[in-house]
Design a protein with these regions (language model features):
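Flexible, small-/acidic-enriched active-site or ligand-binding loops
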Residues: 136, 190-219
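A short, Trp-centered hydrophobic/proline-enriched beta-strand micro-motif
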Residues: 117-125, 169
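Short Ser/Thr-interspersed hydrophobic loop/turn segments at strand-loop and sheet-helix junctions
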Residues: 49, 73-77, 170, 186-191, ...
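Alpha-helical interface subdomain recognition
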Residues: 1-89, 101-106, 113-118, 143-148, ...
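A short core secondary-structure module
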Residues: 146-147, 151-196
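Long, acidic (Asp/Glu-rich), low-complexity accessory segments flanking structured domains
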Residues: 216-234
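Short glycine/proline-enriched turns and hinge-like loops at secondary-structure junctions
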Residues: 64-65, 133-135, 159-163, 177-180, ...
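Short Gly/Pro-enriched turn/cap motifs at secondary-structure boundaries
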Residues: 114, 129-132, 156-159, 172-175, ...
Length: 382
């Protein structure tokens, strides 16, 4: 067993760390305060190959592995969680299904521009009545001639207000449940009958837009179908597995930011005539944060390695996602505690980490659903 990263992985991680420290971190607070979409950062990430880390080079990706992707996403998210989730969605939720199930023509047309950072992608699954029960979709796609006519509303779609392309999950027949689910690639800027609805006001990830997508007799070419009819639910689950690795990496980055900020602050904050870092109560908090975050990163790297080697990674991705997000939330809370009253103030980054961390326990499947996934794999239930 070799825990050492390759020279390429070390080089990429260091490159992303330097870029994130110098270009992203200095504007993270401003992005959070103004809710501004970091378009310039997204373009730069694309130019560096970080919007399609594991996408082959022939589709304008970096052609690297998923282990490298995890390392890169941790560093981006450590600097700015909003930038992290934007990169995660482009790489995983949007990029994975198009890469895995798209035709050659679809990959050239719809994957390459996103992987290269020219435009952004999103994945539209969630509906008001279809959250954890992902098979309960009501968004309807009816085939008429050479087009699908789509009607329905998608909610809480990350980057939905800025994305050019979207992988849309819809049903062709609500009575047939998961068997009727399909995935369509939609050009959101060139689809009659589509419009962006409400852009949500959120607790955290304030520089990442979360929007409602409304389809009213929207026309989508039938050639934009991913795979074949009846394969959509399986594609969806496979894409969510990949997405969970990305969200786990995002969580790990947030947790590491909380830890590093807490370490620095505890060295500088003087109480009772000495730095609070010398107090055992603070030391124990820092030690627990570091230990749990290290364990989470190792779990994520294992899941990514399994994916790279075409092995089943469903259980490991679920484990890594829920553990990483739980310990990130704990680290963020402890970070605020170590900062004391200052941690509650927007002048310091601790409160932002806590707001950003919470969603990682919820999206890409709640952590309760992750435990169901793990338990079913252990027991042998489908």
């Amino acid at each position: 067993m070799n825990f050492a990263p390759t020279e390429e992985q070390k080089m990429v991680r260091e490159m992303v760390r330097k870029f994130s420290e110098t270009q992203i971190k200095p504007i993270a607070a401003e992005l959070d305060r103004t809710h501004r979409h970091p378009e310039e950062i997204c373009r730069q990430l694309g130019e560096m190959g970080l919007m399609g880390v594991a996408v082959p080079t022939e589709y304008d990706g970096a052609g690297m592995d998923n282990v490298t992707y995890v390392m890169a996403l941790i560093e981006i998210s450590k600097a700015c969680a909003s930038c992290g989730v934007i990169a995660s969605v482009n790489n995983s939720l949007y990029g994975y299904p198009v890469k895995a199930f798209g035709t050659e023509e679809q990959k050239k047309k719809f994957l390459a521009p996103v992987a290269g950072g020219k435009v952004e992608g999103c994945y539209a699954l969630t509906e008001s009545s279809a959250g954890s029960d992902a098979a309960a979709l009501k968004c309807r796609a009816e085939l008429k001639g050479d087009r699908y006519i789509v009607n329905g509303v998608k909610t809480f779609i990350t980057s939905g207000n800025v994305a050019r392309y979207c992988v849309l999950a819809a049903t062709t027949d609500t009575a047939r449940g998961y068997k009727a689910i399909i995935n369509l690639i939609v050009d959101l800027k060139n689809t009659p009958g589509f419009r962006v609805g409400k852009v949500e006001e959120k607790m955290g990830l304030l520089a990442s837009g979360t929007a409602e997508l409304i389809f009213e007799d929207a026309e989508v070419p039938a050639e934009n179908l991913l795979g074949k009819p009846g394969q959509g639910f399986k594609q969806m689950l496979s894409g969510l597995d990949a997405g969970r690795i990305g969200i786990g990496a995002q969580a790990c980055g947030i947790g590491r930011a909380a830890l590093e900020d807490a370490v620095e602050y505890s060295r500088e904050r003087i109480q009772f005539g000495k730095p609070i870092a010398t107090f055992q109560a603070i030391q124990f908090k820092l030690a627990d944060m570091a230990t749990e975050l290290d364990a989470a990163e190792l779990m994520l790297l294992r899941a990514a390695w399994l994916e790279d080697n075409d092995l089943d990674f469903e259980k490991e991705a679920a484990m890594a996602k829920y553990y990483a997000s739980d310990v990130a939330m704990k680290a963020a809370i402890e970070g605020v505690q170590i900062f004391g009253g200052n941690g509650y103030m927007k002048e310091y980054p601790a409160e932002r980490h806590m707001r950003d961390a919470k969603i990682c326990q919820i999206y890409e499947g709640t952590n309760e659903i992750q435990r169901v996934v793990v338990a079913r794999k252990l027991i042998g239930l489908r």
